[in-house]
């Protein structure tokens, strides 16, 4: 044996020696111990993480989950029923016995076939989905399956949000297990079928049955049940009413067949039922009878703004998200007590509807569009300015479809000379720049004034002349534009806008000049709506009867949750000081002149003191009147949604309407003056 071979043999023997074998064993031992410790640590960390998520889960309120049959309700100022809340979400809650067995079986078959066996989560399905998704990743497929049970989906729809995260999924699984301890399978399934999104604004099988088939859910046949059962996985993709699916219905037809196949496989329907249903689809397809009719509330003009305001106040007070507050309003069983005076609301509507009130407008005031809606429109708002409670709010003239444009609350327009008390004379007097007897010259602007006001051409008065020196009282009575421009120039644009914004007016980026602050000519860019409306103006003019204090206008008095707890209350007014008591009373007294002996004489009624101001926008396209009494403030707007000339004057049309609606509001009220007069 050579020396090299002997050395090789010795090394081989040393490797196999007991000493070396002991080292390998020790290494493997500690290696596996390390792996085990890492595994234990990982499991512990994951366990702590999961436990922390579970502890942060919202409390399971079984009653809230099942409270879908408690729609939010609105009441008038006497506590009488007014309206059910109707949102864009269409939902008609049905009881278990109204839901066909075939519809229940269709959903269980395609969504959760072991629904009646598991306790809230389907372990077998979870591992199956994990394996399938891993296989899909390895094969390059992008298909990802879900493992949510019907119970989990109910938790997601009723309690959690649609956020995609591990945290949300863990909460969902935990709450599903908890829910199964409190409700029977049928209770869970029924609640699920009342909450499931079914495409568009439809939630629940009853709304879907109405939308697709114009049927009560109890009248659905087997094919219709199978279609709805398959719809929920991808409502848009399987929507039989979409234009794409009308041209090529194979997608939703095949999905419906898949549901029927699964129902047959699980023994929910017989072979004969299955074959008949498949033949029906192959022969006739699925016959849809769409029903897209929107529900209309009893007091459309008042109800929708009240809901909007309640939603915003809930978000401000409780930091709800938009999604959360929408769910609460739609399904939370709230009781919303509005400030609406039912009789006054109805009577104001009648006055605005009456064609006789528009005879002075020669531009065909009773012309209607293709939907039968008057082209000439009107809106009005009446407010108790001491409490801020809105007593009547009408957003349009004549019968109009549901969800029509509310011109009193949501619209913003130029307000014309109605701005003069708010952003010209009120601020001037409040800032000590003048009083009712102070003189301003109604004359053309000097070159210096043209330069400082930004006007290129000489502005004009509506009466096409100049009156020379006028007191503030005279200038506002005849609505001198030149006088207003000069006073507004002294006040300063920034000061005027500051007053206007506190009073509720909205100034866009292109409406921050003297023509806006002095004459109320807002640019009203469609991308930046600005100006005011009757809701804004009625609230703003109430300042002059309330010692210069603006009380935030509210359309409701209180809101109760489904358990009767008060969650919003407006009994304590939200107040903002705008003018001094002295300034506000001087303006109030000045505004009485236009009603007593000016262009708004028709606004007067009975022996109640009335103060107010007309408003006209460029080209006679908007007519307004805003004013107040010692009891209420109100505002009227008349115009076209697509502005056009009306060929008369604001005082001729708006003042009589103001007098009529305020006369109704003051029925049986006695003479008095505004409170706390400043001598």
UniProtKB/Swiss-Prot annotation:
Protein name: Penicillin-binding protein 1A
Highest classification ranks of the organism: Bacteria, Bacillati, Bacillota, Clostridia, Eubacteriales
Catalytic activity, EC: 2.4.99.28, 3.4.16.4
Span list, region Transpeptidase: 378-663
Compositionally biased spans, kind Basic residues: 1-14
GO BP of this protein: cell wall organization; peptidoglycan biosynthetic process; proteolysis; regulation of cell shape; response to antibiotic
Region of interest called Transglycosylase, as start-end residue ranges on this chain: 72-244
Family of this protein: In the N-terminal section; belongs to the glycosyltransferase 51 family. In the C-terminal section; belongs to the transpeptidase family.
GO cellular component: outer membrane-bounded periplasmic space; plasma membrane
Cytoplasmic-facing ranges: 1-30
Pathways involved: Cell wall biogenesis; peptidoglycan biosynthesis
Keyword Protease included in the entry's annotation: yes
Cellular compartment(s): Cell membrane
PANTHER family per UniProt: BINDING PROTEIN TRANSPEPTIDASE, PUTATIVE-RELATED (PTHR32282), PENICILLIN-BINDING PROTEIN 1B (PTHR32282:SF11)
Transmembrane segments: 31-51
Disulfide topology: none
Primary location group: membrane
